[in-house]
Amino acid sequence: MIDFSNFYQLIAKSPLSHWLETLPAQVAAWQREALHGKFREWERAVEFLPELTPWRLDLLHSVTAESETPLSEGHQLRVENLLKNLMPWRKGPYSLYGINIDTEWRSDWKWERVLPHLSDLTGRTILDVGCGSGYHMWRMIGAGAHLAVGIDPTQLFLCQFEAVRKLLGNDQRAHLLPLGIEQLPALEAFDTVFSMGVLYHRRSPLDHLWQLKDQLAPGGELVLETLVVEGDENTVLVPGDRYAQMRNVYFIPSAAALKMWLEKCGFIDVRIVDACVTSTDEQRRTEWMTSESLADFLDPQDQRKTVEGYPAPLRAVIIATKPETQQSLAKKAR
């Protein structure tokens, strides 16, 4: 069984220590009552993977691990087959001992768009909400973060993360918990909170923004990446049954409306730093994700529209700050 005790020990003497009042019981309940029908199969694939210590590890420019001596053909094939038991791989890519996991999304492209606008991540404690398999957490560590904590209730993502971690020498600087943000208490302890590709899946987007704010320490930075539409501060698309074949898309605001929402929730220094149309080069079917992808969700006659007739996916990145309090300012002045 995937073990979270290392994480509990890690946060016991940190600003996250009060999380231990609820977290172990939540994880234990998940292990007893909420396991996916294929979870044991996925977990066995992780267990059968060797724990490898990289001779060369690059998390700054990619997620790449290499050994001093290449794996034998048989050893590499065995590792690759175990990793393929965890398909589909959606977020990446990863290059692990000569095995290139070509994921559905080029998440490295998103990271390259976001990174120039971030405050220095050196020494920061970070929360990544809806972190998927954890690709961006490894890039956060590569950029100098002290600790990256991801939450995502999708259990396949947890097993993918644990598989990658095992092949990175059981690196303890990143951790993934199988929870949704609504299960977190107001920790107010993270220096940076990322929410990328989550907001449009929330039935109440303003509640989500408040939940993100509740996780930030005073003065902390929010990095919000989400679908948007063109328009002014009053523009919000509410799709019908589906958007780009996704059923669970509720609200897609304009970037200007989203900026106003953040300000309404009490964030300051709100700025739109990037907007980019998602291309079929960035999200596509691969050997590691063989089902439908973006090309199947766009109008074949007009790729500026989804198959339902809505504007094609446009994603914006917004950076915002949680205000300092008198108490936090006094503490920093000491």
From Swiss-Prot:
Gene3D superfamilies: Vaccinia Virus protein VP39. It is an enzyme of class 2 (transferase). Its EC number is 2.5.1.-. It catalyses: carboxy-S-adenosyl-L-methionine + 5-hydroxyuridine(34) in tRNA = 5-carboxymethoxyuridine(34) in tRNA + S-adenosyl-L-homocysteine + H(+). One of its GO terms (biological process) is tRNA wobble uridine modification. GO terms for molecular function: methyltransferase activity; transferase activity, transferring alkyl or aryl (other than methyl) groups. Carboxy-S-adenosyl-L-methionine binds at residues 91, 105, 110, 130, 152-154, 181-182, 196, 200, 315. Keywords: Transferase, tRNA processing. Belongs to the class I-like SAM-binding methyltransferase superfamily. CmoB family. Homotetramer. HAMAP family: tRNA_carboxymethyltr_CmoB. NCBIfam families: PRK15068.1, tRNA 5-methoxyuridine(34)/uridine 5-oxyacetic acid(34) synthase CmoB. Catalyzes carboxymethyl transfer from carboxy-S-adenosyl-L-methionine (Cx-SAM) to 5-hydroxyuridine (ho5U) to form 5-carboxymethoxyuridine (cmo5U) at position 34 in tRNAs. PANTHER family: METHYLTRANSFERASE, TRNA U34 CARBOXYMETHYLTRANSFERASE. This is tRNA U34 carboxymethyltransferase. It comes from Klebsiella pneumoniae (strain 342). The gene is cmoB.
